[in-house]
Regions:
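An N-terminal structural lobe/cap that precedes and organizes the functional/catalytic core
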Residues: 1-36
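Fold-level signature of zinc-dependent metallopeptidase catalytic domains
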Residues: 30-32, 37-39, 43-44, 50-52
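Inter-helical turn/loop segments and adjacent helix faces that build the functional surface
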Residues: 51-68
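Extended amphipathic alpha-helical segments with heptad-repeat/coiled-coil character used for oligomerization
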Residues: 69-166
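Conserved structured core elements
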Residues: 42-45, 64, 68, 72
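Short, well-ordered helical secondary-structure segments
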Residues: 24-27, 61, 112
Length: 166
């Protein structure tokens, strides 16, 4: 099916589609930088596929039209998450409310895009807040925690992996 995104599994969890060298086959290689980012990418791929199926059953759209509608819906959900979950955590609900009430202070286009200021500033700020590890799976390995090490793999196996304070 050429409008669904491929998602792979090694039998334990979903993963990004990969080539024979293990490189993710995705539009932006940065979305495979670490376990958590790759997991978010997989979640959006799966969400897109579910939306495609919903569009196909709820409308008469198929092919490129179904893909475009699914893309529009997924993009809207992503933007909703940024506005209602991400931004309030970083800039506070009061500033989000002010922007919604009084408008943004930059020129806009008719094309729905993420402003470059957000791409380069807010996401970089978010990257600086990353933890050294994330508990990634409690269901596998007889309930033992699996830590996805983001920085120092030598911390693997410790009950409380070290942080970045040195």
């Amino acid at each position: 099916d050429n409008i669904l995104f491929r998602v792979e599994t090694g039998g334990l969890f979903e993963d990004l589609p990969r080539n024979s060298q293990g490189q993710a086959i995705i539009a932006d290689a940065r979305n495979d930088e670490n376990l958590m980012i790759a997991g978010i990418q997989v979640a959006f791929l799966k969400f897109h596929n579910a939306v495609v199926e919903r569009v196909r059953t709820a409308t008469d759209l198929d092919g490129d039209a179904a893909f475009a509608e699914a893309r529009r819906i997924v993009t809207w959900h992503y933007q909703w998450l940024i506005l209602h979950q991400f931004l309030p955590q970083f800039i506070g609900q009061a500033l989000v409310n002010d922007i919604l009430a009084n408008g943004r202070q930059h020129y806009t286009t008719l094309v729905p895009t993420i402003p470059v200021e957000f791409q380069t500033a807010a996401y970089r700020f978010g990257h600086s807040m990353i933890r050294p590890s994330y508990r990634a799976n409690l269901a596998g390995d007889k309930g033992e925690a699996f830590f996805g090490m983001v920085f120092d793999p030598s911390e693997f196996g410790k009950s409380d992996p070290g942080d970045m304070t040195g």
